[in-house]
Every structure is written in structure tokens, then in C-alpha cells.
A protein has these predicted regions:
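N-terminal "arm"/small-domain region of PLP-dependent enzymes with the aminotransferase-like
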Residues: 1-65
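Conserved N-terminal alpha-helix of the aminotransferase class I/II PLP-enzyme fold
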Residues: 46-92
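Conserved beta-loop-alpha segment that forms the PLP phosphate-binding cup at the N-terminus of a helix
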Residues: 82-107, 120-121
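PLP-dependent aminotransferase-like
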Residues: 106-166
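Active-site phosphate-binding strand-loop segment of PLP-dependent enzymes
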Residues: 140-200
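Conserved active-site segment immediately N-terminal to the catalytic lysine
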Residues: 206-225
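Short beta-strand-to-turn element immediately C-terminal to the catalytic PLP-Schiff-base lysine
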Residues: 214, 236-241
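Residue-level detector of conserved catalytic or cofactor/ligand-binding positions
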Residues: 245-256
Length: 256
């Protein structure tokens, strides 16, 4: 088991900065030297660690050292088999898991109030949505989560579906019974995908709703920046040991 006290990327960046390396590559601000206005705004400490992928800092496209170790630490913290760092928001994590499980013409069962990133994934990959109406709380005027009965009905009517997609929670904080839905999906040979853009804290608090990985989800897209305290756009794609990693390829480098 890896130490949860470690921060491999942070440690590597501090060491890199201490070496006072003169960069001859991107980014163009050259650790702040080339853009004094931005350096004044963000601070020199920030600018000197905004650097490109290099051997000491690893590469997100094919991590072999500090990024790989950091992802392993994250996976253990979230109770997942694997964790992949995402640098362009949970939108990319949602799209990655949807594209991984369903090819063109194949079905994914999902609530009608999914995030538009899930809809865009269907458009990109050509998968077919089977919508489940989540219902509406008339007093509050907000959409709810999917009921187990409605999901079961959708599964029985679409036994060829490849996955069930669950918001855990919805934008308004409503949770479906993700454990029962995961069990239903698996009983019919389907993956369970959890959009946990607003559920990062479920993994680290007492008396919280059940987190996706603990409920048996095969994939979970987790927004670290929304309730995890990290910078905007940072996210994780978590996978369980039920997932063949050849289904997934995250190709977002730290710097284009």
C-alpha cells in the first residue's frame, strides 16, 4: 500500500524548481520571465511550476514515474483499481467512460437529466441513449434520480444495452440507489457508469451517500475541483478491476 502522505507530482515540481533549470521549450512565459504581468498577477511561485512534460516530471500520455505513482495513490484513496488524471474537466472523463463501453449503434441506459457531456459522448461515438425519466419534485421544481424500478424496466426492455449511466448525485444533490442499480446492471451483463462530478466528497465523509466505487460501479468520473479542493478542470476517471484497460486510452498531455 502506498503512503497517502505522499504527493509525488508536487515533490517533483519542487525539486525541478530548486534546480533552476532554464527552459528552452514551452510554455512561452519561461517560468514567468517572459510575462511579468502574469507573474505579478499569479505570483512567481506559481509560474515557476507551470512547466512542460519532461523526464523528471513524467508525461500524462504515458506515465511511468511520478504521475503513475500519484495515480496509484489516488486509486487507493478512492477504492478504485485505477485512477486516470484528467486535465480538461470531468466532461472528458464522462466521455471517456461512455466511449469505452459502447460503439456506434449500441445502447446506454441513462437518466434524461444527464450532463451534456454524456450527450456529446453519444454524438461522438454514435451510441444510442435509452432514457429513463427521473421524475420531478413538484414542490421544489427539481428533477430527481432514477428509481430502481424504472431502471429495471429499461433493462428488461433493452437487454442488449451495454451500460447503465447514473448521476451520483444530480446537480441538485439527489442520489439514486446506486448499489441496487449497479447490482441490476451487472446481473444483466452491463457496465455501471457513475457521473460523480458533484460527488467527490462521498468518498471521504461519514454519513454520506454511497460513492460509486463502493457501490460497485465499473467507472466513475469524479470532479476533484468541484468538491475536492483542486484547481478548475482537474478530474479523475476511476475504474474498477472489472474493466479491461485496453478499453480506455486517455491522451491528454500536460501541455499541448
Amino acid at each position: 500500500m502506498l503512503s497517502q502522505e505522499r504527493a509525488p507530482i508536487y515533490e517533483a515540481l519542487k525539486e525541478y524548481r530548486a534546480k533552476r533549470i532554464v527552459p528552452f521549450d514551452v510554455p512561452g512565459h519561461k517560468m514567468g520571465r517572459g510575462n511579468p504581468e502574469l507573474t505579478e498577477f499569479l505570483g512567481r511561485e506559481c509560474m515557476t511550476v507551470d512547466v512542460n512534460s519532461s523526464k523528471p516530471l513524467d508525461n500524462l500520455c504515458h506515465p511511468v514515474s511520478v504521475i503513475k505513482e500519484a495515480e496509484q495513490i489516488a486509486a487507493e484513496a478512492f477504492g478504485a483499481k485505477n485512477a486516470f488524471f484528467i486535465v480538461n474537466g470531468t466532461t472528458a472523463a464522462v466521455q471517456a467512460m461512455a466511449l469505452a463501453v459502447a460503439k456506434r449503434g449500441e445502447k446506454i441506459i441513462m437518466p434524461r437529466n444527464v450532463h451534456r457531456s454524456a450527450i456529446n459522448a453519444l454524438i461522438l461515438g454514435g451510441a444510442v441513449p435509452v432514457y429513463v425519466n427521473p421524475g420531478v419534485n413538484k414542490e421544489l421544481g427539481i428533477p430527481l434520480g432514477m428509481t430502481v424500478e424504472d431502471v429495471e424496466k429499461a433493462i428488461l426492455e433493452n437487454p442488449d444495452a451495454k451500460a447503465v449511466f447514473v448521476n451520483n448525485p444530480t446537480y441538485y444533490g439527489v442520489c439514486s440507489d446506486i448499489k441496487k442499480i449497479a447490482d441490476l446492471a451487472h446481473a444483466h451483463g452491463m457496465y455501471l457508469l457513475a457521473d460523480e462530478a458533484h460527488g467527490t466528497h462521498f468518498y471521504f465523509g461519514d454519513n454520506m451517500p454511497l460513492a460509486g466505487m463502493k457501490a460497485g460501479a465499473d467507472f466513475a468520473a469524479v470532479s476533484m475541483h468541484k468538491s475536492g479542493g483542486s484547481l478548475t478542470q482537474s478530474s479523475f476517471l476511476l475504474t474498477a478491476d472489472t474493466v479491461n484497460l485496453s478499453l480506455i486510452h486517455i491522451s491528454e498531455p500536460t501541455r499541448h
